[in-house]
């Protein structure tokens, strides 16, 4: 512990975010990092607890507490404080394949479990992580490190999201010959087309992919395995196959008028915007536009917030975000004690921007759509909303949200974006390989394992565990790499 009194001497300081009315003028990342001197003070705030909950990654009441990757947080916090950036990077890379991604998009369960947060502000772990990886790129330490020895084993990874990339990275480090197949035109999966550019600039993904290419990983794009690329061919040519296709089957809503023109899944809205942005800076018009439209976003999660921020950048006339559940409290309640994930109200960047542009929070709680109304041509013109209340089911005893009769109200709507989560993987890939699915439509495996019912076929990420965080996907990718390595070699020395 470099500075035992650091948490007493220094307050938490965050990097500055551009003002909402400025940052909505483009799709660029908008956070300015701290100076090196400021960052070192933040590293000094780490208490190096006897039991560092920040790296625990344990499930508590259905939510993760601490980092699922078990990052060596106290160690690299102390190294940041002492200015040993190279050593900090080496400690960080021991557990995290992609700190350049997690330091931008992770909700930081490590900080929620930080002991400093018991009586004050937690250590700025996420910003320290960001500083470490960016410094490593500046100094060249994050550059290519090809394996010194190669095996004769060939592995196909289907999907280039965080889980597939993590598996490929680890297996390549072991010396295996890895080919990643991606159905889209660009590598990155969820990272590329599911997360807006202002949260994760796509050049950051390309930077890492280029490093992986130089280290020996092969990438094949526009390879839609199960459709234009035969599963049988892969099973014949490769010693092992890893299915990491994500949970890309969006949850729909059953509402009268759902077939109206102007209702889309959030993932299609976000993907089309990013693709057009990268191809033409939105000049080709090949995207779902929210310009001058009254937008309704159904869903209160991160994807819903991304839709709000994206619609505002398009120049929407208004934006409303519907949340079925009640508004969360400002502070932890007695039944949500530390180190559980704090179930408290958070105003994210998209909501901040809506407040700045329209003068009010876009979120309406305990509300859903009762009906969509379309004109004679089939175009959406308005939505009928209805309030919800919590009610206990007399048969099951479970609480659920039910409509409040007589609470209906009409609102104008030209564009509706459904951000209601995902049901699981699209089944055609699993069908092509003959792997079994479980009741949740995820690929079935034994508990804690990654092997499917088909010989030499493994699975990981959201396709395996269901919709989750990027950090969980990386965790799964690293774990499946160990299982594949042991399957091929009889043992594994992967961490």
Segments and roles (model prediction):
Residues 5-32, 41-44, 68-82, 89-92, ...:
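Beta1-alpha1 glycine-rich phosphate/pyrophosphate-binding loop at the start
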Residues 13-37, 42-45, 365-367, 373-374, ...:
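C-terminal catalytic lobe of FAD-dependent flavoproteins
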Residues 25-38, 64-65, 69-104, 108, ...:
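Ferredoxin-type iron-sulfur electron-transfer modules in oxidoreductases and energy-metabolism complexes
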Residues 131-149, 207-227, 250-314, 437-453:
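Glycine-rich dinucleotide-binding loop and its adjacent helix/turn
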Residues 149, 154-158, 206-255, 370-385, ...:
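Feature captures the FAD/FMN-dependent oxidoreductase FAD-binding
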Residues 159-162, 299-301, 462:
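Glycine-rich Rossmann-fold phosphate-binding loop(s) that bind the pyrophosphate
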Residues 261-292, 391-467:
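FAD-site-proximal beta/loop scaffold in flavoenzymes
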Residues 304-307, 314, 463-494:
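A conserved FAD-binding loop/helix module that cradles the flavin
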């Amino acid at each position: 512990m470099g500075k035992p009194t650091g948490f007493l001497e220094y307050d938490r300081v965050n990097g500055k975010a551009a003002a909402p009315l400025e940052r909505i003028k483009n799709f660029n990342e908008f956070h300015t990092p701290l100076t090196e001197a400021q960052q070192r003070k933040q590293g000094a705030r780490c208490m190096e607890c006897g039991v560092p909950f920040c790296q625990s990654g344990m499930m508590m009441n259905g939510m993760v507490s601490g980092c699922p990757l078990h990052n060596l947080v106290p160690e690299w916090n102390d190294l940041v404080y002492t200015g040993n950036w190279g050593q900090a990077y080496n400690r960080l890379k021991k557990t995290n394949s992609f700190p350049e991604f997690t330091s931008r998009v992770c909700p930081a369960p490590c900080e929620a479990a930080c002991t400093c947060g018991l009586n004050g502000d937690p250590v700025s772990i996420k910003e320290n992580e960001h500083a470490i990886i960016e410094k490593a790129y500046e100094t060249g330490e994050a550059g290519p490190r090809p394996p010194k020895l190669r095996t004769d084993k060939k592995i196909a990874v289907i999907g280039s999201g965080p889980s597939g990339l993590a598996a490929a990275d680890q297996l390549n480090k072991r010396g295996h010959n890895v080919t990643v197949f991606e159905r889209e035109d660009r590598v990155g999966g969820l990272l590329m087309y599911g997360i807006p550019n202002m949260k994760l600039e796509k050049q950051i993904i390309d930077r890492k992919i280029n490093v992986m290419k130089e280290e020996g990983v092969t990438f094949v794009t526009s390879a839609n395995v199960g459709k234009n690329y035969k599963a049988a061919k892969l099973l014949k040519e490769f010693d092992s196959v890893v299915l990491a296709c994500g949970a890309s089957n969006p949850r729909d809503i059953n509402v009268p008028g759902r077939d109206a023109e102007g209702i889309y899944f959030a993932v299609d809205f976000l993907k089309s915007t990013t693709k057009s942005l990268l191809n033409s800076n939105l000049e080709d018009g090949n995207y779902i536009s929210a310009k001058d439209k009254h937008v309704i976003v159904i869903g209160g999660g991160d994807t819903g917030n991304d839709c709000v921020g994206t619609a505002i950048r398009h120049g929407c006339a208004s934006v409303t975000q519907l949340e079925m559940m009640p508004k969360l409290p400002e502070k932890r309640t007695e039944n949500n004690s530390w180190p559980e994930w704090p179930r408290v109200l958070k105003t994210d960047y998209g909501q901040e921007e809506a407040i700045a542009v329209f003068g009010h929070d876009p979120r309406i709680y305990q509300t859903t759509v009762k009906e969509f109304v379309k004109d004679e041509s089939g175009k959406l013109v308005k939505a009928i909303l209805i309030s919800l209340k919590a009610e206990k089911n007399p048969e099951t005893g479970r609480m659920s949200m039910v409509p409040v009769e007589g609470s209906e109200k009409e609102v104008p709507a030209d564009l509706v974006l459904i951000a209601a989560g995902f049901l699981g993987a699209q089944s055609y890939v699993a069908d092509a390989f003959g792997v079994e699915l479980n009741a949740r439509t995820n690929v079935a495996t034994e508990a804690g394992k990654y092997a499917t019912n088909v010989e030499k076929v493994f699975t990981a990420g959201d396709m395996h565990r269901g919709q989750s965080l990027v950090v969980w996907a990386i965790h799964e990718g690293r774990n499946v790499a160990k299982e594949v390595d042991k399957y091929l070699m009889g043992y594994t020395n992967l961490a």
